[in-house]
Amino acid sequence: MLTRFARYLVPSVLVVGLMSLGAPCAAQEVGAPDAPDAHEGRGSVVAPSPWLTVSTPIRRGVDFKLSTFYIGEFQVPVVQIDVPVRATKFLTITPSYLYNWVPASGLNKMTPQPLGATDSYEENQFRIDGTVTFPIQKFEISARNMYVRRFREGAANDIGRYRGRIGIAHPLAVGGRTWKPFASYESFYERKGGWNRDRVWSGVTIPVTKQLMFQPSYMWERSHGNRDVNYVLLGLIVNTK
């Protein structure tokens, strides 16, 4: 059944992309089939999404990060592996791999009108990105450019995607600890679909202990052919350094 909609496949998977704004900040993605343009139908959806990232150093300037999260409304598990490499003081290069699986029930919730899908959908992604981070007074500015190769099942063709994101963060002293509020905007481009997705994301990174941080955040996503999604994200970041 899913192959009927394969030519409309455009991602809508909560992708855990780790972004360096002084402290780790996790963002996301959910890949799902899109129906043809529908201007009427079901409205936006709220998706509570817990996640966990564990980071450990491999050697000086190179880390290994394992992230997992669950998009409750769509019943989607996601796993991502990142290997950030600190190339210069301001530039980090990160190769990464992401896997997600969407059940048929999740596919039917993502679009303005139910797809009638009876099969699940899975996708593998290999990505490479470069993130430039620099300070302006106490603000931390970041700009990330990412290339994603999407390997999709069934009749859907493998395709490439560009993702561009700009972000800002600012440390804030609270009760003897340094909290870090942040905000970012990201856009997505694919050769056939053009600029087909936007994300606005905001939250705060809160240190709990030296090796543990808590990050509540909110992300709004608009994508071509899918319902708008309001992600309510609750994450834990564990650093073994």
Features from the language model and the residues they span:
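Detector for outer-membrane/organellar transmembrane beta-barrel domains
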Residues: 57-61, 142-184, 238
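N-terminal secretory signal peptides that target proteins for export/translocation
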Residues: 1-7
